[in-house]
Amino acid sequence: LCASIAARVPNTSIAFGIDGATGTESDRISDSRFCSQCNAPLEYDYVQYGQLGAYHCPSCGWGRPTLLRRVTGVELGCDGYGFDLAFGPEANAPAVHIATRYNGLYMVYNVAAAFFAAHELGVDAAHLQPTLDAYVPAGGRMGRWDIAGRTVEANLAKNPVGFDRQIQSIK
């Protein structure tokens, strides 16, 4: 878990993630099922996929840190996800709405990571959506083609969690 790495290094870290259950079906594959502090089984309030979600250790109390940058209001539509990026832990923190034409909950995390990092570097939030709209995946990833009247999408899965996410996106 990233939080356990952040706790071991002197660098400043900013915890971010989806703040709340999304209602999407989570997989049962997890890279991290045990507490990095005491090795007891972790408990989750909700799981997005893999090890991502709200976790805590009932044995030692270690858990997901407070999210300093939050993704809220995640909604899946026919053409991708819409969500809000909140630039603080407070309910009334400044936020911007983002829409991505790519499906897969992992894209919400990818977009959030890139945009929160850009924000930390001083990029104005007004530039976020136009930048995403101009994005073209490399190497055929997430490519879409019309073949015989149907839309075909290609994607890449490099590990069991990624493969499970692709299967879930088909459902």
PLM features per residue range, with description:
Residues 1-4:
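Short, polar loop motifs at secondary-structure junctions
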Residues 62, 117-157:
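Gly/charged, well-structured mid-domain segments that form the phosphate/adenylate-handling core
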Residues 54-57, 99-133:
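A conserved, hydrophobic alpha-helical segment in the catalytic core
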Residues 90, 105, 158-159:
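Short, glycine-/Ser/Thr-/acidic-enriched flexible segments
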Residues 90-100, 145-150:
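Glycine/charged-rich beta-loop-alpha catalytic/anionic-binding loops adjacent to active sites
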Residues 6-95:
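Extended acidic/charged loop-beta regions that coordinate divalent cations
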Residues 26-33, 39, 138, 156-171:
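Active-site beta-alpha connecting loops in nucleotide-dependent enzymes
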Residues 68-70, 99, 165-169:
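Glycine-rich, charged/polar anion/phosphate-binding loops
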